[in-house]
A protein has these predicted regions:
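Aromatic pocket-lining residues of Rossmann-like dinucleotide-binding sites
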Residues: 42
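Class I S-adenosyl-L-methionine-dependent methyltransferase module
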Residues: 45-131
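S-adenosyl-L-methionine
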Residues: 1-32, 37-38
Length: 131
């Protein structure tokens, strides 16, 4: 199963082996969510997904809240902004706009992840996304 994000350290390729070591129970706790590869490849009744990256958590919250709207907006952005200059404009708005909604920040985060270098997620000392 693939995930919506490209992510360094993604566990998709090792899931068949990793699943052998996961405990049985009603809930899987995933403290380092990343691409959520473990969650996507298992069928626990519930999950606790956590990560230190607030942009990543915001993305998952917005997708969970309104998946169809998220997909629709991302689809338009991916089609219309598939150029280098658009990437840098979106990154600029993602980093500096004070008027961007959490919903659009999540859409932009997905765009930056999918269009950036190998799905890397890196922030500079000022806390700005810089891939």
């Amino acid at each position: 199963m693939s995930t919506i994000l490209k992510w360094a350290g993604n566990k998709t390729a090792i899931m068949s082996e990793l699943k052998k070591h996961l405990p049985a129970g009603p809930r899987l706790v995933e403290p380092f969510a990343g691409s959520c590869a473990v969650m996507m490849a298992t069928d626990y009744p519930s999950y606790l997904v956590a990560d230190i990256n607030p942009d990543l958590i915001n993305l998952y919250k917005k997708v969970a809240a309104d998946c169809e709207s998220f997909i629709s907006r991302a689809r338009v952005l991916f089609k219309e902004a598939n150029r280098e200059v658009a990437y840098y404009n979106i990154r600029q708005e993602f980093n500096y706009s004070t008027e961007i909604t959490d919903f659009m920040k999540a859409v932009y985060f997905l765009y930056l992840n999918r269009h950036g270098y190998r799905g890397l997620c890196r922030y500079n000392k000022s806390g700005h996304f810089n891939i």
